[in-house]
Amino acid sequence: LQQNQLADESRLFIFSDAAARAEEEENVSEVRQLIKRISGFKQIEIIERHKNLGLANSIIDGVSRLVKQYGKIIVFEDDLISSPYTLQYFNNALNRYESEKRVMHIGAYMYPLHKEVETTNKGGLPETFFYRAATSWGWATWARAWKEFEPDIDKLISQFNSRKIHEFSIENNMNFWKQVKEFKAGKNNSWAIRWYASVFLKRGLTLNPSESLVNNIGHDGSGVHSGMNDIYNVVVNHKPITTFPEVIDENKIAYQAIKNFLRTRKGSLWQRLIRFAKQKLSA
């Protein structure tokens, strides 16, 4: 992030959560010492939590606070590697679509779609496109969109029917509805699935790059919310984004490519067994 174009013109707010358990306090202290040495930004403000909020509550509180103050926000978690042009992409998109009410979210991550694009469209995808689902690995939004965020899972669920569940789940190719049900059952504490559901129910759109501008390196098993998984690993695009969609509608070719990726992402039974064995060996 420090090496991004526009970093030296950006205000950086770092939200440091408190330790969830006593044995984690030393690690939190080390992280807080590290972030105090960060430089390269126009302004840096560190918000140290005195009690553990957890990822979901920390994100919701931080985003709500900053969009109220600034009207828009760019959000990174601490396990992301970004292109040097990621901030430029976010800022350009935030300015371009500020008044487009249907555009509610800007994502920086995109699945590795090369094979899917080759089979669905020989001409490839545009640099950026609109899609229905909201990604959480590097994203941005506006106060006018965030005010539509509904944290109450029961209120969200009550607005879905079987058709909407089918569309929400990318025609049952992604476990988004399972995540909703698991949140309801107390099995996860995801802010992201509630945000996507909020966007979806408002018929909102998300802007995305066809080549990912971030990669999540938190899948090595060391992060709190991580798991060994290389399915979503990408090569970060190191070129600036220069074109944005004029038509405010979901890109059908991109949707088909994403659907194909999600349907085949886990590979054959043999590939799944190998991946499972690697996870067990690394545990």
For each feature predicted by the language model, list its residue ranges.
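An acidic/histidine-cluster motif and surrounding catalytic segment
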Residues: 1-75, 80-283
